[in-house]
Regions:
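Conserved kinase catalytic-core segment
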Residues: 114
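Low-complexity, Ser/Thr/Pro/Gly-rich disordered linker/stalk regions
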Residues: 1-111
Length: 114
């Protein structure tokens, strides 16, 4: 069995409040309707925005879900959006053909969180 070799890492060593590095991370915005998959294919209730992902003071990526009650998030496939969040992807930016991907994450308990 061969020894594992690290070929890429993302440590988020950016100033607090910074957006994730756009040379690595792209954002999907909206509710999926623009991609032909309203609710992103699994009835997600949030609308993805540019404001809900940032680097915190511990150099960690923070993705924040926010409840919206004033209609300021715009419309979702089901009506006025009630939640905003962020959707980050590495599509067309970082590639892996084989191997193992490891991530350390903290996710709170609750409906719709995974």
């Amino acid at each position: 069995m061969s020894e594992k070799k690290l070929i890429w890492a993302q440590d988020f060593d950016l100033p607090a409040g910074s957006a994730p590095d756009s040379s690595i991370w792209a954002r999907d915005l909206g509710d999926g309707s623009d991609y032909g998959i309203p609710g992103w294919g699994n009835n997600e209730l949030q609308v993805y925005t540019n404001q809900n992902a940032f680097v915190n003071s511990q150099s960690q990526l923070e993705v924040e879900a926010k409840r919206v009650v004033d209609g300021s998030a715009g419309d979702a496939y089901y009506g006025p959006a009630q939640w905003t969040s962020a959707r980050l992807v590495t599509k067309n930016k970082v590639y892996f053909q084989y191997g193992q991907i490891e991530i350390r994450t903290k996710v709170p308990r609750g409906k719709g969180l995974w």
